[in-house]
């Protein structure tokens, strides 16, 4: 085991990034066994590498090491950067103060964008898997890094992604093998890619990925006139109506967040069990090899 609570050095972080570039995320044991990195990471375990990479790649706020980790993941697959591709959050009613903030946050240029069709999160997942074309499929970290790199995702994107991946696997749209996801051969990729790619053009954005207060499958894109109409309707509400709508939105958000959190916990538990089983299998294999060598020596 590694040394817990020991601060990571810059040299160790660089070795971890180089190892991920060379072997891919999730190959912690392979990175530790690689002579190129074992001399630097000898104090670290596969769990240490996994936790450090997760902290580097999915920090909740700011750029910092999160942006550095994105650059490291980007080097594993060469993708053309879609300039200014972003998704702005479409918020539900929460309070009068938030309504005022939403008014300023959703303002667009003098030329209002045309009406755009609904965008599904599963289309973005299919786009990521089809574009990366990794052998054996893509893991959750790689898929999330691709979507976050190409579009602006909400803070709770990791939990939404875990829930959506679990749903797509259960309904047969994705196949999960060794914590990697791939698209079955019978699934038409062109329709998914058209849905994911056809709506992200131009510099001004009012679209969004699902947040806890929106449906996990679809988010409606609104034109400026629709936004103005909605704001006018909100201003005409009395205090009791606004409070009731806000309370309902908060309740729906809490329910969605609880469901997503439960799904994320189940996924993490399954991942931990798989790693434990892999470690046990390796130890059992070593023991069996040792016994076979002893038997051969006795027979000789």
Swiss-Prot record:
Domain HTH myb-type residues, every copy: 1-58
Region annotated Disordered, chain positions: 93-119, 185-213
Record-level Gene Ontology MF annotations: DNA-binding transcription factor activity; double-stranded telomeric DNA binding; promoter-specific chromatin binding; protein homodimerization activity; transcription cis-regulatory region binding
Residues annotated as transmembrane: none
A cellular component term, taken from the record's GO annotations: protein-containing complex
Pfam families: Linker_histone, Myb_DNA-binding
Subcellular location: Nucleus; Nucleus, Nucleolus; Chromosome
Role: Binds preferentially double-stranded telomeric repeats.
Subunit field text: Forms a homodimer and heterodimers with TRB2 or TRB3. Interacts with POT1b, TRB2 and TRB3 through its H15 domain.
Domains as described in the record: HTH myb-type domain confers double-stranded telomeric DNA-binding while the H15 domain is involved in non-specific DNA-protein interaction and multimerization.
Family (UniProt): Belongs to the histone H1/H5 family. SMH subfamily.
Protein name per UniProt: Telomere repeat-binding factor 1
Organism: Arabidopsis thaliana (Mouse-ear cress)
Source taxonomy: Eukaryota, Viridiplantae, Streptophyta, Embryophyta, Tracheophyta
Gene: TRB1
């Amino acid at each position: 085991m590694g040394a817990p609570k020991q601060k990571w050095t810059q040299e160790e972080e660089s070795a971890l990034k180089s190892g991920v570039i060379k072997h891919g995320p999730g190959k912690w044991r392979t990175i530790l066994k690689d002579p190129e990195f074992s001399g630097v990471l000898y104090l670290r375990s596969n769990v240490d590498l996994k936790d450090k990479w997760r902290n580097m790649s999915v920090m909740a706020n700011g750029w910092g090491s999160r942006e550095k980790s994105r650059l490291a993941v980007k080097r594993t697959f060469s993708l053309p950067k879609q300039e200014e591709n972003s998704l702005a959050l479409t918020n539900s009613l929460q309070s009068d103060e938030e309504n005022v903030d939403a008014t300023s946050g959703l303002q667009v240029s003098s030329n209002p964008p045309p009406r755009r069709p609904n965008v599904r999160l599963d289309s973005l997942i299919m786009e990521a898997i089809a574009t990366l074309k990794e052998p054996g499929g893509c893991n959750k970290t790689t898929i999330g890094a691709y979507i976050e790199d190409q579009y602006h995702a909400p803070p709770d994107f990791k939990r939404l992604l875990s829930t959506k991946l679990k749903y797509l696997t259960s309904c047969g749209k994705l196949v999960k093998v060794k914590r990697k996801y791939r698209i079955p051969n019978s699934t038409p990729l062109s329709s998914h890619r058209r849905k994911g790619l056809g709506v992200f053009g131009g510099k001004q954005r009012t679209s969004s990925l699902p947040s806890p207060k929106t449906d996990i499958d679809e988010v409606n894109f609104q034109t400026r006139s629709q936004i103005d109409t909605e704001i006018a309707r909100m201003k005409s509400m009395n205090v009791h109506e606004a409070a009731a709508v806000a309370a309902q939105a908060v309740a729906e958000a809490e329910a969605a967040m609880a469901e997503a959190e439960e799904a994320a916990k189940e996924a993490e538990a399954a991942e931990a069990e798989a790693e434990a089983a892999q470690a046990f299998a390796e130890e059992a294999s070593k023991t069996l090899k040792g016994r076979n060598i002893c038997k051969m020596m006795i027979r000789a």
